[in-house]
Amino acid sequence: MAKPKKGAKVNNPNRKSRNQKVLQTIADLQKRIDEYDPATDEQSISQFKHLPISEGTYKGLLENNFVSLTDIQKKAIPVALKSEDVMGTARTGSGKTLAFLVPVIEKLIRENITEYDGLAALIVSPTRELAVQTFEVLTKIGKYNSFSAGLVTGGKDVKYEKERISRMNILIGTPGRISQHLNEAVGMETSNLQVLVLDEADRCLDMGFRKQIDNILGHLPVTRQTLLFSATQSDNVKDLARLSLVNPKRVGVSSDQEVSSIPESLEQYYIKISLASKMDVLWSFLKSHLKSKILVFFSSSKQVQFAYEAFRRLQPGISLLKLYGRHKQTSRLETTMKFSRAQHACLFATDIVARGLDFPAIDWVVQVDCPEDAATYVHRVGRAARFGRQGKSLLMLAPSEEEGMVKRLEAHKISLKMMNIKQKNKKVISPQLQSLCFQDPELKNLGQRAFISYMKSVHIQKDKDIFKVEELPAAEYAKALGLPGTPNINIKNGAGNKDKKNMSRELLALQKPEKQKSDSEKVRTKYDRMFERQNQTVLSKNYLNMAAGDDSGSEDDFMSVKRKDHIIKDEELPDLSVPVSKRQSKKALSKKASLKSKGNPTKLIFDDEGVTHHLYEFEDEEDFKSRGDAKLQKAEFVSKENEAMSKADVDDKATAREKRQEKKRRWKEQERLAREQDEFSGSEDEAHTVTLAGADIDRDMDYGRSSEDEQPPSKKPKWFEQEKPKKKKVDIVEVEEPETLEDLEALTAKLIGS
């Protein structure tokens, strides 16, 4: 068989038949969609298999246990499959994510989009966590389709994303990063875009992304299909819908209905407590719900950090996590995954997790700080009781916030049950917090910044019927946080601070006047560098500013405009008495002179419960009389002391009895040792033995021996050559049997001499 020439086309019948099969499947799918009427067939569909969707999409849904349709999915998916614009509104946790992901996948399948067709679907989410969650759901249900999907969020490498963004068919991201790529990325072509999805549109507008969304809409073709989903329908959302949607179909909650309703399986409670008792109540709540999954909301990130660090040191017995906007992206994702997989845990968070995130099986949602409006309350409590599960919520309200907030919620048909706290179950932790702040300056600094950020968050709220900063007990709240005093707060004009906070750094730099040069552009002399030197052993600049009352640091939760030029007149300077001689200057710096201005020293001690006391505490006469009659106090004191002495007497008698027994044991032991020593000394005396015997002929007869017969003395063996140890020699004195008196006298003399 001859080989085909190089460059000649090769007809592959299998490939051609496969393409024809795909086209036939798409045509059949389009025919089913055209014949489908959402108005008449809505009552007959209850599962995904009843929808005109492809086999691959249905298989991916079935593998992830997505079988039945929710209300919003039943109304939105059929309309979106017919390529019409949709404006969907539904309660939180109702399944809005699948309501737009399924139509997006089916739209790309019917248009026969491949990896060479570029960007075909764009999904905009308000937060990074929600974008990541949407991307994960897309990869699960779309695993049997050949589309390429990408995720672009803040906190990642922009250059890395630009190199690969041109090959994506579906792009999911946050408004800021998508707008940046549309302006800067060369390969990001949007002329072939088929679908645009705006998820949690109201949240995007509340977070200040209106300009970014307008920029995104300006880059997209007019012929696209737009799906807008939101939990509430505010005026801003309606304005956005008029600009981005063409003859939209409204599904879910109608436009004349109130704020999104609360899930029916959610139990809602609120308690009325003072601002100073919130930390105590939160601690008591955690200690009594150790086998629960709890989500705690604060109004600022500094409060989240302080509560996390303080409770972590106190060890409540449950896993603690924290999540706020200034976290790094990797840390935020890690925290989100840990809390999702945990069975019993507590997450301290800001409103960054109040929208769209699906944490499974949350038992309690606790709002330590009052939400800014009813919509924020709805989104916070919507993290629990999702998809028909059971859940509970608890709202802590200060006395100045109760009346106004309850009225706002009742106006939106949200009723709360009031809960009373049993004082015996309430645990006070302010002494422990005070002890921790005394031992750790960093925790004290966090507490000061948490106090300031909370006061500022209350001050900038628009609803002054609820948020009354002048009625808050600042001194008591600072004491409850464990602070030694009330920090100084410089609240400046907050108008435009939110816009400045959400504005990019490049635009903020362009708005500055040209005369105000940055410190890096100024020429610094040798003397400038000398005065700018700082000792390396001092605390951080941020902490020093806090100690001095300057709370306008760059890491604060709110931006404030600082004054650049400080003009101080000469008459405003204080008249200081400067020493004129070395002797006077040395005397002024002496310890004796410094003690005059400092006053008397004070020393504090901590008891076992962490409460501070002065080293010497005396009771006044008035305090003594206020406790009752002196004779009754005397009798009570004497009875208490007698009872204490009787208890101590029993212990003393037992101690004395043990001492006597021990003394008796030692005396017996000494007697035993003395007796053994006497027996040992007696055995040594018996070693000298006297033997009485008769005449010894061999000894008495002295045989003459020649020198030849004498043997030389043998060599003394070494200590290691001796086979047996030498025994102690016994002195034996042998004498003949005495016969006369002279023999007895000689024997006696010999014994005495030996």
UniProtKB/Swiss-Prot annotation:
Residues 638-661, 668-678, 696-708 have a biased composition (Basic and acidic residues). A motif (Q motif) lies at residues 46-74. A motif (DEAD box) lies at residues 199-202. It catalyses: ATP + H2O = ADP + phosphate + H(+). Residues 265-429 form the Helicase C-terminal domain. One of its GO terms (molecular function) is ATP hydrolysis activity. Keywords: ATP-binding, Helicase, Hydrolase, Nucleotide-binding, Nucleus, Ribosome biogenesis, RNA-binding, rRNA processing. Residues 583-595 have a biased composition (Basic residues). Its EC number is 3.6.4.13. Residues 77-251 form the Helicase ATP-binding domain. GO terms for biological process: rRNA processing. It comes from the Eukaryota. ATP binds at A90, R91, T92, G93, S94, G95, K96, T97. ATP-dependent RNA helicase required for ribosome biogenesis. Involved in the release of U14 snoRNA in pre-ribosomal complexes. Required for pre-rRNA cleavage at site A2. Interacts with the U3 and U14 snoRNAs. Associates with pre-ribosomal complexes. Belongs to the DEAD box helicase family. DDX10/DBP4 subfamily. This is ATP-dependent RNA helicase DBP4. It comes from Meyerozyma guilliermondii (strain ATCC 6260 / CBS 566 / DSM 6381 / JCM 1539 / NBRC 10279 / NRRL Y-324) (Yeast).
